[in-house]
Every structure is written in structure tokens, then in C-alpha cells.
Amino acid sequence: MAVTLDKDAYYRRVKRLYSNWRKGEDEYASIDAIVVSVGVDEEIVYAKSTALQTWLFGYELTDTIMVFCDDKIIFMASKKKVEFLKQIANTKGNENANGAPAITLLVREKNESNKSSFDKMIDAIKESKSGKKIGVFSKDKFPGEFMKSWSDCLNKEGFDKVDISAVVAYTIAVKEDGELNLMKKAASITSEVFNKFFKERVMEIVDADEKVRHSKLAESVEKAIEEKKYLAGADPSTVEMCYPPIIQSGGNYNLKFSVVSDKNHMHFGAITCAMGIRFKSYCSNLVRTLMVDPTQEVQENYNFLLQLQEELLKELRHGVKICDVYNSVMDVVKKQKPELLNKITKNLGFGMGIEFREGSLVINSKNQYKLKKGMVFSINLGFSDLTNKEGKKPEEKTYALFIGDTVLVDEDGPATILTSVKKKVKNVGIFLKNEDDEEEEEEKDEAEDLLGRGSRAALLTERTRNEMTAEEKRRAHQKELAAQLNEEAKRRLTEQKGEQQIQKARKSNVSYKNPSLMPKEPHIREMKIYIDKKYETVIMPVFGIATPFHIATIKNISMSVEGDYTYLRINFYCPGSALGRNEGNIFPNPEATFVKEITYRASNMKAPGEQTVPALNLQNAFRIIKEVQKRYKTREAEEKEKEGIVKQDSLVINLNRSNPKLKDLYIRPNIAQKRMQGSLEAHVNGFRFTSVRGDKVDILYNNIKHALFQPCDGEMIIVLHFHLKNAVMFGKKRHTDVQFYTEVGEITTDLGKHQHMHDRDDLYAEQMEREMRHKLKTAFKNFIEKVEALTKEELEFEVPFRDLGFNGAPYRSTCLLQPTSSALVNATEWPPFVVTLDEVELIHFERVQFHLKNFDMVIVYKDYSKKVTMINAIPVASLDPIKEWLNSCDLKYTEGVQSLNWTKIMKTIVDDPEGFFEQGGWSFLEPEGEGSDAEDGDSESEIEDETFNPSEDDYEEEEEDSDEDYSSEAEESDYSKESLGSEEESGKDWDELEEEARKADRESRYEEEEEQSRSMSRKRKASVHSSGRGSNRGSRHSSAPPKKKRK
């Protein structure tokens, strides 16, 4: 494939070069032609000549001479390079419409016949303007015969040479959008390598107290850029280091980029690291100082350095002189810390682009160039030869601080930092515990174990008043959150007050709009039951009149044979009858008179002359009504699923074959009855899953609320889970949770297999599984990184924090619930569990009692019409970690010993929100003595007294009787398979009656104990968990009184 040249970019840039030359400013004013020659030298990394070539053509062209005259451009190169340059030479009239001069191409020969080509170029120089002065890059000297002969030819003619390095650098310093994108990418790769490799490696070295040489660590950083996981999706062949990484510590510091990492061992003090990565010829730079146990003075100096960088960023604006930027920073040093004036670096940074360091754009006191929008600088500030007064060893006494970033000059406001690596003390400081502190802690622990509570109480008395325990800090923060919670809820309800709720239009079930549309069948005339399948109507004789009933009005039917007769009983829906969860209110006029049931009787005996028995009509009617009813309910269910579905944009397919793609994945929920494998591919605006049989599921990026990546650590599957903003339809159902997963290892274990701990097959299988896990994790991570790069990080995948996870039962089975940065999730079990933290109003812990091993967690949403979420059976050991996590997320939590009837509580709030907040709002959940209206605690007793001990039956009743439609989309209802038979209630069975008797006995025993302890409990000090009303009713899991307190 031929190498292509970006013609538009070439014409744009050569026009800019000529435009600046013709303006005649600075060195441009005196030159008649520009001569640029590039030879072959592997040791030269940065040169103006090669930078100009890369800027114009996108590539370096060795052994090439470029002569820019006033009215023409001449390129002399090898035959292959001339073919490449023909892409810009062969234009209409050999001159670009933008006014770029015509191009002449000369082929370089390998023998001495180049003289004629040299003469042509010399003649062109002489004809350009005055033909005496030529602009050259005086520092660029390339070896080789070709370069020497050309240099001799120029010297022979006696042209005056003017160094134009600075003015050309200023011309190409302003970056176009394409160049800025490359520099941003280079900066992001540098940040990735620093964060994910270097910083982590230094932490490991410090933690393990390893001895590692600076040079070895620098080499490992260079090797890291060969691994794709640190390159943010970039091709490794396009990435290289700008210079070998510079790592310094232990008193030997030189804050320049020309030094090399020495072979000394890393000292755990101030560790400076400078690294720069080049992406597609464009450079970036990053400098950070990692500090191990910094003293207060070191931290103060470091914070002052950050302050200076902020000042520098503010001054880097379009139109400001570079020397003014430098002077303003120096003024801050003189005013605030003049003793550091001789310690600061001589310059504060330099321009950067294709060349790492642009010598003419150094930020110092002498540079008169003005900054322009689109310029990119590497800003580097540091203090060297600082003295650590607390240092004892020679390497501890002297330290240096050095920070640097790649920044972009904007038109207004401070410069934009492209290397987004955090640099505050808390981010770069590594704080270790002293051995003495650790010994003291161990001694305290031992003392507690030996002496028990007496010693603990003695140690607690030593605490000063200013010290606060974690629990006290949490409580203080929770009080602040409680005040904010009620205020925000009031404001939110006030805003929503004016919003009208859209009432759903009821579907009309009129079979025939007028009598003429009724069918004229013999069955109807013969006063038999007839089913009109087309209009889904049952026509029955009522008082001798054929009366149509739509299938939607029929609740159920039953048929029975008694003696010589067959009975067909038809039950209808009517006001007052129990409706199923999915039926809703289907009566447009509930005040009308309704038929509740009709029973028909027919003889089983054949009359003389009749071919069939009369009961055959009832038998056929029973069968056909069942069929029509089933078809109608199935269709209604499908229509209900489609209700409220937001129409999605069409997926824009990316025809590029290098799209991020994952193969051999399963989808949940299944598209068909049987699970099928397929592939997930990222396109321009969304994902497409294609199964092996061709089914397609599209998920758009803008419809994804949470994108979760659940690694396979400790799990049997590896999952990509998408929680959607609006439901999507596939498999005839709507889904707000879609996930793609693959299994890791064997889900089942052969228990009959003979196992031995040293069995080679087992060891090999374990090794294979480990490798498979690693391979899958790498594949998924690469996919995620590519997708994030493709979407410009608009879509970010969250990884659950397994360390913060806790067990609970949000549905029927217990699973591990794990927080992410914005949600609480479980993606490995099905149905999945996802709660968005931004939508949560507060969390309430129920059944928190000393003698119970677990408790329940209730999640109340900001949308009060939404059903609360219950997580049952959470181990008590998880209570404090959950509180700590919720507190860190600024979420209000409360706790109590009782189980509350949340359906009634939420209905009370929705019916009268103003009254609810006037009575103190959510403070009724606070334990006695802590709520803001504790003294008026009895005023809310109406709500609090609605407590009960929930059993499975209670939860079912809540769901049935709820006025709100709380049905979750994750739940799969099987109402299409509901029995259509008689709904006669059956009596309670023996097990239920025995259970009720046991409960009655237990409650009577508790009431006796309660009477004895009530007088004592009033005298005790009120604590978080003491509640007179709930003490006997909440303790349904234990018959024994509490024996010990939980810490």
C-alpha cells in the first residue's frame, strides 16, 4: 500500500510559512531564500530540519534538500521519495489555489551527476529576490557525501547565511486541531504510564523496602510502553520515549532534562521523576515528586511550588509576552518566600511540539516572543538544594522538589493542563507508620485482650476532648446530612407541585359499535353460545337476547358435569372483585350495574332425532373461550411491555474493521429460549450484539446509565453489564438491564472423581484456569480501553469495589452486593441488582438488635412514588463498613429495631407531603433523643405504630394491595400461565394454624417479661437501640434475652 501525504495539511502549512516570511518580521526580513537539507544520522533525534519536514509532509525524508524561493519550491530526493512528493507536485497548473508556489522535483543520483541539479537549485536561489542571503538552520549538521557536496557548493557561491531556527519554530508553534489531538493523546499516555506503572511500582518498592537502582527503574518504565495496557488504546509502534526517564533521590538532584538516571539505590525521601512520551512524532512531558513521610516544612515548600504553578498557568494567556509570565512568578517568590529565590529553576518551561524542547520559546526573563492561542508548553518548576532540618543521614539532609505538566495556551483564562495526574500532597505523599507507633498499637491490643473492658475504659479516659472517634465523626456528618435532606426534599416537592401527572387513557373494549355489525350465525339464532374470534367476543343468550361480552370482561370460566347435565360457569370482572396485579382499574364507569356471573346448563342426553348432545355447545364454548382468552392476554402483555418505550436513534455502523470487538459472549436476558453465543462490537454511537443465528441487539452509548465491568476475580463469570436509562425491547419483553458475559473455568464439579492434592491433571487444569482468567481479563480490559478512547471517555466503565462488598438478599437468594463510584450493584446473579446512588434519598436499617445475627436495609428514593428497595439478611458484621461507605458518599442513614410498613409510610408522604415535612420529615426514623423533633416523637406515632413482623405472606399482600404500580422490570411475571379456574378461597392448612399458635404463645410470654422490665428500662440511659414499643415485636428471631452488647 502506497504511503499517502495529507495534501490539505501541506498546502495549509506551506502557505503559513510563506505568509510569515512575506510579512518580513525578525530574521525573515533579511533572507531571499530558505535552504533546508536533511541527511542520515541515527543519533540525531530532534532537529529543526526534520521537524519542518514532519510538519509539512507527516514524515522524515532523509537525504533530501528543500529550497524555498520567492516564487518556486524545489525538492531534491531519491527516486522513491520523489514519487511520494508527486502527490503535492501534480496539481492543476502546478500551483495550488491557495497561492503556494509551484513545486519542482529533482531526482538525486548516486554518482557525481548531481552537479546539474545543484546548479539548478543555485540558479533558483540567485533569482529569488536579491539572491544573496539564505535562511538556514545553523545547528543542523548532517554527515555523508551527499550533504558535504551540497554544503561545498553553497559555500563556493558565497551566500550569506542567516539562522532562521527561532522564527520557523515560532511559525510552527501554533498547533492545528489535528496536532493538538495528537499531543493530547501523547499526554494521556504519559499520564497512564505514570499512574498505572511508575507510581504503583514506587509504592511496591517502598512497601516491600526493596533496593532498586534509579537506572533499573528507568529501564522498566521504558519497557512499560511496549505493553498495550498502558497505552490507552494506542498502537505501540507509534509510541516512543522523548528521552530516557529521569529518576533522582537521596540528595543527588539535577533538575534538567539532559541528565541520565544514575546507578544509586532509590532513597525513600523526595523521589523526582521526569518522563515524556512521543505519539506520532508529537511530544508530551510530565514531572512529579513522590514524597515518603515528608516533614511539615517539606509539605509547606511543596504547596508553595503548587501555588507558583497555579500563578504560571494564570499568566499563560494569548498575547502575553513570555518574559512577563516569568517575571510575574518571580514576583510571587520575592514577596512570599524570598529565601527560595536562588533555589528555583532558571527557566520555568519551554515550547513543545514535534521537537521536545524549543530553545526559542523558553520561559525566562529575556524572551520577548508573545504567546499565541494553540501553543503547547512543558512547564517545569522546581526547588533544588533545599535543606531538611530533621534529616540525620547525608542523603536525607538535601532534597529537591520538581513538578511539571504539558499545557495548552487558551485565548482567555488560564492554560489547560493536558497531563491530568493529581499532584496534591495527599496524592503524591506516601505516609508510613513508624515502628514505634506499630509497637505501641500492638501493646494496646495485647493489653485489651488481657485486661478486657476495664483496661479499655482506662485507655479511653486518656483521650482528649478534641479527639473524635470514627463513630462520632459519622454522627456529626449525619446530623448535617439530615438537615440538608429535609430542606432538599421540601424544595424538590415544591418544584414538582405544579407539574400535572399525565393520566393514562383507558382502552375501550367495545366489541361492536352498532348491532348491524354482529354476526348472523345459526348458533345465535338457536340461542347457543357463540364465540366471535375476529372481534374477541363471546355472544351469550341472556333472557332470550343475544348479548355480546368482550373477552376482556371475562375473569375466568369453569365447567363441571353433574349427573345428566353439564354446567358452564362464567365469572366477570366487576367493581369490588379482587384484581390481579397486572389488571389495574378496567372500569370506565364503576357506578353502572354489572353482571358478576352467569351459569348455563345443558343436557348430556341425546334427544330423539338430534345428531349431537346439547352439552356439546358448552364444551366447545369452554375450549374456544380459553383459547381466545389466552391469545388476548398474550397480546395485551406484549402491548404493555411496549408501553413507554422511548424510540432510540439508529445505530451508526462503523465500517472500519478495527472496531473494538469481543467474541464468544452470552447475553442475559436470553434472546431465545436457549442461550446463544455471539459477539459484541462497538460502533460510532453504540454497541451491537450479534448472535450466531443472526439476532441483533443494539445499545446506544447515550442510553447507558451505568456501564459496569465485573472482573472474574472470585467469580465464575466475567461480565460487562449495562444499566439503561430507557428500556429496550427484545425477545418480546422490555429490559433496562442487559449484560454480556463469558464463563471462566468449570461451573460444575465432578464429586465422584478421585482427587489427590498432587494429581498432575488437577494441577494442570488449575494452571490452565489461571491463564484463562488472566487472558479473559486482559481481553475485556483492552476492549473497555478502546471503547473509552472511541467515545472520548463519554462512556466510562465502573469496576465494583470488592473490598467494600457485603452479602445480602435483594431478591430471593443471597448475593455479594458491591459499591461502585456511583451505584450499588450485583451483576453476577440474575436478576441483577443496580441502585443509582444519586437517586437515593436515604437508607434505613431495620431489625438492628444486639441478639440478631443479621439486619435489613431499606433504600428510599428521591422519587417518592417509586417503591422502596429492600435488602434482607445482611450480616451484622457488615453494618459499620456500610455506614462508613454511606457516610463517605454523603448519604443519610438511620436505624431502628422495628420493621416498618413502607407501603403505608410512602402513601402517607405522597398524599400529604407538606404535612409530613411540617411534622419533622424523616426525623421520625431517628432513634429517640437524636431526632430534631424528639420531644414530639408521639406525634408521628400513627406512622410508627404501623409496624409489623414481615413474613413472605405480608410481602405478597403489600405487592397486591399497593396503590402504586411498583412492578419491577427485572421481575418476570408468568401471568399468561395463570390458572383461569375458579378463585374460591381455601381454608388455612394445619402448618399455618400451628405456626399461629406458636406465635401467640411466644407473644404472651414476651408480654409478661416486658411488664417486669419496663420500669427498669425507663431509668436506663437512652441508647441508639433502645425502644419500648419495638423490643418484643422486633425480636422474632430469638426467644432468649440479649446476653452481650455488640461493639
From Swiss-Prot:
Modified residues (Phosphothreonine): 903
A Pfam family of this chain: SPT16
Biological-process GO terms, alphabetical: DNA repair; DNA replication; nucleosome assembly; nucleosome disassembly
Biased composition (Basic and acidic residues): 985-1005
Disulfide bond annotation, renumbered to this chain: none
Regions annotated as coiled coil: 465-507
List of residues that carry N-acetylalanine: 2
Biased composition (Acidic residues): 927-973
Keyword DNA damage: yes
SMART domains: FACT-Spt16_Nlob, Rtt106, SPT16
Post-translational modification: ADP-ribosylated. ADP-ribosylation by PARP1 is induced by genotoxic stress and correlates with dissociation of FACT from chromatin.
Annotated compartments: Nucleus; Chromosome
Keyword vocabulary terms for this entry: Acetylation, ADP-ribosylation, Chromosome, Coiled coil, DNA damage, DNA repair, DNA replication, Isopeptide bond, Nucleus, Phosphoprotein, Transcription, Transcription regulation, Ubl conjugation
N6-acetyllysine: residues carrying this PTM: 139, 196, 223, 513, 732, 786, 904
InterPro entries: Creatin/AminoP/Spt16_N (IPR029149), Creatinase/aminopeptidase-like (IPR036005), FACT-SPT16_Nlobe (IPR029148), Fact-SPT16_PH (IPR056595), FACT_SPT16_C (IPR048969), FACT_SPT16_M (IPR013953), Pept_M24 (IPR000994), PH-like_dom_sf (IPR011993)
GO (cellular component) term, any one: FACT complex
Chain residue ranges for the region called Disordered: 491-518, 918-1047
Positions with biased composition (Polar residues): 499-514
Family affiliation: Belongs to the peptidase M24 family. SPT16 subfamily.
Entry text on domains: The C-terminal Glu-rich acidic region is essential for FACT activity.
Subunit structure: Interacts with MYOG (via C-terminal region). Component of the FACT complex, a stable heterodimer of SSRP1 and SUPT16H. Also a component of a CK2-SPT16-SSRP1 complex which forms following UV irradiation, composed of SSRP1, SUPT16H, CSNK2A1, CSNK2A2 and CSNK2B. Interacts with NEK9. Binds to histone H2A-H2B. Identified in a centromere complex containing histones H2A, H2B and H4, and at least CENPA, CENPB, CENPC, CENPT, CENPN, HJURP, SUPT16H, SSRP1 and RSF1. Interacts with GTF2E2.
Name the UniProt record assigns to this protein: FACT complex subunit SPT16
Organism in which the protein naturally occurs: Mus musculus
